[in-house]
A protein has these predicted regions:
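Long, charge-rich, low-complexity alpha-helical segments
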Residues: 2-8, 13-15, 20-23, 28, ...
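Glycine-rich, charged/polar anion/phosphate-binding loops
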Residues: 223-227, 348-349
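C-terminal amphipathic alpha-helical segment
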Residues: 256-332
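Active-site region of the double-stranded beta-helix
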Residues: 2-31, 44-217, 225-275
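Secondary-structure transition/turn motif
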Residues: 43-44, 162, 364-369
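Acidic, low-complexity/disordered tracts enriched in E/D and polar residues
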Residues: 300-383, 407, 418-419
Length: 419
């Protein structure tokens, strides 16, 4: 969790995470995060999720937004429907053949297929904003899918996910059955299909939770928890917010990446070695174990090297998350009228590493580096705090310099006009 929740974000002056849980954020972090499910009833939460998704919004996405695969898939009884059965060309001027075909989806849906709309954090404006706030709250990359299930249909058989999930019930009722993990904290390369038999056996045992979600309810599922869901009565819609949490394994993976700098470890094994003979390979395994142990011991006393490992995690996070979108036309208009009274703010969710050289300060972004004179350092630190400020308030810069710097950072997508 972020150390400071911004109470002004999210509807109803609650943080994005706060809207999804019936306990306070610290209790969630200490007692539930990655440990056990949390069921939060609508009566325990302050508001519905109608601002995020509705049945009308689903129809709009299907019929009027030109959504293409892989942003959608359909399934029935655990089997995926070939995309050719629910996509088609959009006709003259839009000949791409993988666009959603609303009539074909109607037919498949009426036949009992569940529709999954994927990547809604990149498609649907309310969810773009909400997920950006949630990433700030929870500190891990997040994404959103929507599951639209026909009456009394089960979209997918019992399975587990390799990411944490928040389930938000939008409309209709859906029965959820949960069982404890057969593999705790699975990594992304450890899917449930690798343990299909164990999952099926666990799924016939007495459930940890058997409940019906109604509109406005929310359910948190740590990764690895086995679950299945069945629509009851009318069509049901729920959102799943998937959270791809960074783990200690990620730290270890980046730590071991340091070992590639060791020339001896990069040496080839002997020519003629029989790699199928474990006894022949074992001495080299033992030697590498000793070498790695020695290098790790050296890392304990090398704070700069450990810091570089931490920075690698930050770069990975920046690479797989996205800051708030910018409005190109609005920004250009704002830049043209920029003066010392204009208010700017750091672009939400934008990660920048700071370095200095040759009287310059460098902002390392995901896809480029922005360099400015060293006298901008205090102003950059001020802006990185995330608080809006007027151009005239930029620390250490005179009026003309402040305007030049603000305009440059707006153009580079580092700053945005303050609301």
């Amino acid at each position: 969790l972020s150390q400071t929740a911004d109470d002004q974000r999210g509807s109803g002056n609650r943080s994005a995470l706060g809207r999804l849980i019936s306990v306070d954020e610290r209790t969630f972090a200490d007692d539930y995060w990655g440990r056990k499910p949390l069921l939060s009833r609508a009566s325990e939460l302050q508001e519905s999720f109608d601002d995020l998704m509705t049945p009308a919004a689903v129809d709009e996405l299907i019929s009027h937004r030109g959504v293409r695969t892989p942003f959608a898939r359909m399934a029935k009884d655990g089997s995926l429907l070939d995309k050719s059965q629910f996509t088609a060309s959009g006709g003259f001027g839009a000949e791409m053949t993988d666009q959603l075909d609303s009539a074909a989806i109607l037919s498949a849906f009426a036949d009992g297929h569940t529709l999954v709309l994927q990547g809604l954090h990149r498609l649907w404006p309310p969810l773009i904003d909400f997920v950006r706030d949630l990433v700030d709250d929870i500190g891990h990359p997040s994404q959103v899918n929507s599951y639209i299930t026909p009456a009394s249909s089960k979209g997918f058989s019992p399975h587990y996910d390799v990411h944490d999930v928040f389930v938000l019930q939008i409309s209709g009722e859906k029965r959820w059955i949960l069982h404890p993990p057969v593999h705790t904290h699975p990594l992304s390369n450890q899917p449930w299909s690798d343990r299909k038999n164990a999952v099926e056996e666990r799924a016939i045992e007495a459930p940890h939770l058997d409940t019906v979600l109604q509109p406005g309810d929310a359910l948190y599922l740590p990764r690895g928890w086995i679950h299945s869901a069945e629509a009851l009565g009318d069509t049901t819609i729920h959102l799943t917010i998937g959270v791809s949490s960074f783990t200690r394994y990620d730290v270890a993976h980046n730590l071991l990446g340091v070992l590639q700098e060791d020339a001896e470890l990069r040496e080839p094994l002997p020519a003629g070695i029989d790699l199928t003979d474990a006894d022949a390979v074992l001495p080299y395994v033992d030697r590498v174990v000793d070498d790695v142990a020695n290098l790790l011991q050296q890392l304990k006393n090398d704070e700069p090297a450990r810091r570089r490992i931490a920075e690698r995690l930050g770069r990975r996070f920046a690479d797989i998350t996205r800051p708030e979108p910018v409005g190109p036309l609005r920004t250009v208009s704002f830049m043209n009228a920029l003066d010392e009274d204009s208010a700017v703010v750091w672009r939400q969710g934008l990660t920048a590493s700071i370095s200095r050289s040759e009287n310059k300060i460098h902002l390392g972004l995901r896809d480029k580096t922005v360099s400015l004179p060293d006298e901008c350092a205090d102003a950059i630190a001020q802006l990185q705090s995330g608080k809006p400020c007027r151009v005239s308030e930029l620390v250490g810069l005179d009026s003309n310099s402040a305007i030049v710097v603000a305009r440059r950072l707006l153009r580079e997508g580092v700053l945005v006009p303050a609301p």
